[in-house]
Amino acid sequence: MSKIAILTDSSCDIPQEMAEKYGIDIMSFHILLDDVDYIERESCTNTEFYDKMRAAKGVPSTAAITPIQFCEKYCQYVDEGYTDVIHVPINKSGSSTYNNALMAQGMLREERPEHHLKIHLLDPHTYSMVFGWYLCEMARKLKNGAEISHVIHEFETQMDCMEIVLGPYSLKQMKKSGRISAAAAVMGELMGIRPIITLIDGKTRVEAKVRGDDKVVPAMVELCKQRSEGVENFDYMIGHTNIPQTTDLEKACRKAFGKPPLLVFELGGVVSANTGPDTVALVYTGHPRG
């Protein structure tokens, strides 16, 4: 009889109660900010981390989970009698974590040469609850008797059409991290320019620029409507950093799409370290990219 584990990392942004409900195993990233090492999901709450970023002098940096850490986790599964582990780490193009997991498989063969654990390593090509939600769906279906090959195929098919629109209300973090120039950030702040950014297949792109905070939510919703027009089984989620505009985005989405979001969730430390602590995100079903 199969005994299956689902393993991911803290970039998934799965709320703790959902992780416990579906038995999702989450390994935490370390985030360094102003010489202080924070363990995501352990050292502080998301809200506390947003406040620390706003007050920080420097830029947060994240450390990839190491091959040794992954090997130890795989060994644990072997020792506990698991037959399979579905391992979905952070987007491969944005971190060395995926490659570290590959290295750990070789280390496992040395540590447990007689092991029979099947490791299904998947690249979600994205971040946050864009894949976190569907890991929970995967766990639910496995519990109801679905085959591993079936849930993996469904997951990969779903990831092929998921998109994110980001609305940052401050350019401070992007300036610090070098994602935009200091001059562009200063001019943007002075003129109230806000970029509307898509995150698709792990790549960011500025799709539009609006002037004034009140234009951000309408632009995000309009872009989502354009990119998802004609999509069957459309759904959406809202990510946030506990800012007032979260409510504005949810109201606008309910009106535009005629349905509530699957989930309203907090952006975790790894994600907000890149987007900044004053950001809302609209996650939605787009067209398959093939």
Predicted features by range, described:
Residues 69-108:
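N-terminal glycine-rich phosphate/adenylate-binding segment common to multiple enzyme folds
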Residues 55, 83-87, 111-122, 264:
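Glycine/charged-rich beta-loop-alpha catalytic/anionic-binding loops adjacent to active sites
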Residues 3, 11-25, 30, 36, ...:
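Mixed-charge interfacial surface used for oligomerization/domain docking
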Residues 5-7, 85-87, 267:
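Short glycine-aspartate micro-motif
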